[in-house]
């Protein structure tokens, strides 16, 4: 679980790169110190790259994007109007038919209703079945391109 959360929280290098390119940046934890008007403009955080999943002895089905989405579940729990999704631009994620996964503030509740604990599914590397149970898989079909993975946090501000 720590490696998945690190993926979600490890933004410093991307932040510096964006600043070096002259882009305007904001850290989410700083928004509470800013004005309400400036916070209203934050609508999406987009990241690219590819994460690594280190499989243990026990593993189910899923890919790195599905694991990232499942790892976001406890971070999003109870948040309104905020979601996270991550997908492979080639339309496949790991050895599955899904391109990636989706989670929002209600995903934890929906998983609990299905009897699935996100931490257990992550430990077993079985994000596919966990997300499938709550309709949290993203499907695009093969795209014919493979640029990178794309992860997005959407915030209705």
PLM regions: where:
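A glycine- and small/hydrophobic-rich beta-loop-beta segment
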Residues: 1-70, 74-78
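Internal helix-turn-beta structural module
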Residues: 61, 70-157
């Amino acid at each position: 679980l720590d490696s998945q959360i690190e993926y979600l929280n490890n933004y410093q290098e991307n932040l510096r790169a964006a600043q070096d390119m002259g882009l305007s940046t904001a850290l989410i934890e700083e928004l509470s110190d800013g004005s309400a008007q400036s916070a209203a403009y934050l609508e999406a955080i987009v990241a690219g790259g590819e994460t690594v999943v280190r499989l243990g002895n026990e593993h189910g089905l899923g890919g790195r994007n599905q694991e990232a989405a499942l790892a976001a579940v406890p971070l999003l729990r109870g948040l309104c109007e905020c979601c996270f999704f991550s997908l492979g631009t080639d339309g496949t994620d790991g050895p599955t038919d899904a391109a990636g996964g989706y989670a929002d503030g209600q995903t934890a509740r929906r998983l609990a209703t299905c009897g699935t604990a996100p931490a257990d599914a992550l430990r077993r590397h079985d994000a596919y079945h966990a997300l499938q149970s709550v309709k949290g898989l993203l499907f695009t079909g093969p795209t014919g391109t493979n640029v990178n993975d794309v992860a997005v946090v959407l915030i209705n501000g």
